[in-house]
Amino acid sequence: MKLFSASVFAAIIASHYASATAHIRAPNVKPRRTNSLLTAPPQQPPLPSAQQAASASSSAGLNLTDIQGDILIGMKKNKELFFFFSITDAATFKAKLGSDILELITSTNQLLAVATQPITAVNVAFSSTGLKALGITDDLKDPVFEAGMLSNAVSDLSDPGTGNWVPGFVGTSVHGVFLLASDTIDNVNTELANIQTILNGSITEIHRLQGEARPGDQQGHEHFGFMDGISNPAVDGFTPPAEIRPGQALIPPGIMLLGEANDTFQNDRPPWAKDGSFLVFRQMQQRAPEFNKFLQDHALNMPNMTSEQGADLLGARIVGRWKSDAPIDLTPLVDDPVLAADNQRNNNFDFSDATNQTRCPFSAHIRKANPRGDLGGINKFPNQHIIRAGIPYGPEVTDAEKASNSSSTDPSLERGLAFVAYQSNIQNGFVFLQKNWVDNTNFFRPGTGVDPLIGTNSRNSGTDAPNTPRVVSGLDPNNATSTIEIGIDFVVSRGGEYFFSPSLSAIRTVLSV
């Protein structure tokens, strides 16, 4: 464990136990906005107002001025850049982090009101090797984070090796990531240039990924066409009880934030880590043309349905929701956009009456990733909840790709999801979901198969041999025992890393000292 001087140690303790007002920074004199930088798809649970969050956090003892803004806000950005970097001059980086970068970091409290939102929101997170580069060797009690994603990508995440990974993610050179979000890419690029100027050559760019909400009525939808982020849990101390939507899980803050109530290692983490969160990043390429072709080729044959409607039904059963976001557990054969837009109803289901798969297949993506009533209810497995905060990247499918039913090999046309998930324990959160539920052929019933949407062929046979078609059951409502063989991965991992998103006070008193 790193030894600090007496003065530094005193500063850490003083900051940790200081009142909430001690963390409130002087107002930033930079221009403020008149319209929100956050998106608000009606299907997703709304954010609390600043006043509501202040009341909820006060009763739970959360300090929203000290928690980085992306952690609890979730998937509500229009443009977001992920800038991955390596620290080449630790002394300069630490000095600039404390003197200049810290005032740019956006807190949760700042994001909740337009009047306090910056033109571009900025968050920062560090890998295990990044913390070590800053001289931080304290044990955060998360061995998955400590080892890095490269160590468990094959064994736990079902990546068939790193052949498809972005080169920058192969190795330990990624020390950190800046997350920059705004309503225009120009704003994002301006703030990035400002950060690079401030850091004065103390970092080197490893990789960058520009995320962007899809246009028009596809805002909030990923590239397969389905709405994302509907099932994010409510966090006690952030979401007021009156704003919790039917079917939405309520979890203790320690499931997301280190050192808070119900954190598995609440009393074992270093004090400065309180109110930080582990950020899982995965660049997930989506083969949208191939997915759509698969639906066309295997369209379900249902009475009074056209082939196109049968393809839409198959897609809905693979995902567990229609493209409008209406859940098939509530409307199993026809889409219901009115239901989808009603956030009082669109998440209010639990699979508990569906034992024959006529409504929702056991293998459906949303059932694999969030089994709800299959395991006793949404609040019966709180440790397995994560907050997803990702965003699509890449252009819309081109006419040429539609015509060929094949994704272009042009790197500029790659599209997918910049997957981001927060939790206080990566093993209990993201890794558990991926390994024990999504990629487990016998969850939650024997013979279910892997997740047909994001599962990979390499794991289906129990080996890591690639190109082994995965077999999924239950997708045909007329014959639950029938199986469909899926010979292509619709989602391809391009790599990623595990990061720690520290509190603002930790940046000030530990990481920049």
UniProtKB/Swiss-Prot annotation:
<feature type="signal peptide">
    <location>
        <begin position="1"/>
        <end position="20"/>
    </location>
</feature>
<keyword id="KW-0479">Metal-binding</keyword>
<comment type="function">
    <text>Manganese-independent peroxidase that is able to convert a large number of compounds, but its physiological substrate is not known. In addition to classic peroxidase substrates (e.g. 2,6-dimethoxyphenol), oxidizes dyes such as Reactive Blue 5. Also degrades beta-carotene.</text>
</comment>
<dbReference type="GO" id="GO:0046872">
    <property type="term" value="F:metal ion binding"/>
</dbReference>
<feature type="propeptide">
    <location>
        <begin position="21"/>
        <end position="55"/>
    </location>
</feature>
<keyword id="KW-0575">Peroxidase</keyword>
<comment type="subunit">
    <text>Homodimer.</text>
</comment>
<dbReference type="GO" id="GO:0020037">
    <property type="term" value="F:heme binding"/>
</dbReference>
<dbReference type="GO" id="GO:0005576">
    <property type="term" value="C:extracellular region"/>
</dbReference>
<dbReference type="GO" id="GO:0016121">
    <property type="term" value="P:carotene catabolic process"/>
</dbReference>
<comment type="similarity">
    <text>Belongs to the DyP-type peroxidase family.</text>
</comment>
<keyword id="KW-0349">Heme</keyword>
<dbReference type="InterPro" id="IPR006314">
    <property type="entry name" value="Dyp_peroxidase"/>
</dbReference>
<dbReference type="Pfam" id="PF21105">
    <property type="entry name" value="DyP_N"/>
</dbReference>
<protein>
    <recommendedName>
        <fullName>Dye-decolorizing peroxidase msp1</fullName>
        <ecNumber>1.11.1.19</ecNumber>
        <ecNumber>1.11.1.7</ecNumber>
    </recommendedName>
</protein>
<dbReference type="InterPro" id="IPR048328">
    <property type="entry name" value="Dyp_perox_C"/>
</dbReference>
<keyword id="KW-0732">Signal</keyword>
<keyword id="KW-0408">Iron</keyword>
<dbReference type="GO" id="GO:0004601">
    <property type="term" value="F:peroxidase activity"/>
</dbReference>
<dbReference type="InterPro" id="IPR049509">
    <property type="entry name" value="DyP_N"/>
</dbReference>
<feature type="active site" description="Proton acceptor">
    <location>
        <position position="228"/>
    </location>
</feature>
<dbReference type="Pfam" id="PF20628">
    <property type="entry name" value="Dyp_perox_C"/>
</dbReference>
<dbReference type="InterPro" id="IPR011008">
    <property type="entry name" value="Dimeric_a/b-barrel"/>
</dbReference>
<keyword id="KW-0964">Secreted</keyword>
<dbReference type="GO" id="GO:0140825">
    <property type="term" value="F:lactoperoxidase activity"/>
</dbReference>
<feature type="region of interest" description="Disordered">
    <location>
        <begin position="33"/>
        <end position="52"/>
    </location>
</feature>
<feature type="binding site" description="axial binding residue">
    <location>
        <position position="365"/>
    </location>
    <ligand>
        <name>heme</name>
    </ligand>
</feature>
<keyword id="KW-0560">Oxidoreductase</keyword>
<dbReference type="GO" id="GO:0005829">
    <property type="term" value="C:cytosol"/>
</dbReference>
